[in-house]
Amino acid sequence: MGRGKIVIQKIDDSTSRQVTFSKRRKGLIKKAKELAILCDAEVCLIIFSNTDKLYDFASSSVKSTIERFNTAKMEEQELMNPASEVKFWQREAETLRQELHSLQENYRQLTGVELNGLSVKELQNIESQLEMSLRGIRMKREQILTNEIKELTRKRNLVHHENLELSRKVQRIHQENVELYKKAYGTSNTNGLGHHELVDAVYESHAQVRLQLSQPEQSHYKTSSNS
């Protein structure tokens, strides 16, 4: 049979109460540790026994977690109060104005517009910042040039490959024409012919074939005229 439901109420027997407190306290601290590790949560646990003995656990530190808790509660209360909310956004606006002023002043110093009153150390810091910026610009420029060179090399190799492929096709077509010429006129006619002479012979043979094919039409035309 299953265990009966335990009634949650104060344990009267002091010995049983102490044993239960010890077991439940250890289990609670174990669960707090697991929650902090598994969920990357900031956990703080504070326990006082009925004898005023302190037990605590914190994933970071009890003090920092309590300070964070107090700050969060204070901000929450301020946001719930309209007047406090206005003050909050006023502080935010003032902070942003100060940051903007600092950025503008830094920009003027980096561009050399506002250098009066700066010490030697401050000028050296500005010089170091400019040198770092120049190094970054040079590195970016070199990277862009390297990428462009790689792309041009890739295109050159592609064109070279296409030229080789076209050259192979031309040679293959020439060989086919030579084979056709040999079949049509025999191998004896090709002996002793150079490359250009053989090409001329192939094209000349093609012209003769076209001429021979057109002669019957001319003969028929002449016969019709005589009749």
UniProtKB/Swiss-Prot annotation:
One of its GO terms (biological process) is positive regulation of long-day photoperiodism, flowering. It is found in: Nucleus. GO terms for cellular component: nucleus. Keywords: DNA-binding, Nucleus, Transcription, Transcription regulation. InterPro entries: MADS-box/MEF2_TF (IPR050142), MEF2-like_N (IPR033896), TF_Kbox (IPR002487), TF_MADSbox (IPR002100), TF_MADSbox_sf (IPR036879). This is Agamous-like MADS-box protein AGL17. Residues 86-176 form the K-box domain. PANTHER family: SERUM RESPONSE FACTOR HOMOLOG (PTHR48019). GO terms for molecular function: DNA-binding transcription factor activity; protein dimerization activity; RNA polymerase II transcription regulatory region sequence-specific DNA binding. It comes from Arabidopsis thaliana (Mouse-ear cress). Residues 3-57 form the MADS-box domain. It holds the Pfam family K-box. Gene3D superfamilies: Transcription factor, MADS-box. The keyword Flavoprotein does not apply. Preferentially expressed in roots. Probable transcription factor. It comes from the Eukaryota. The keyword Transcription regulation applies. The gene is AGL17.
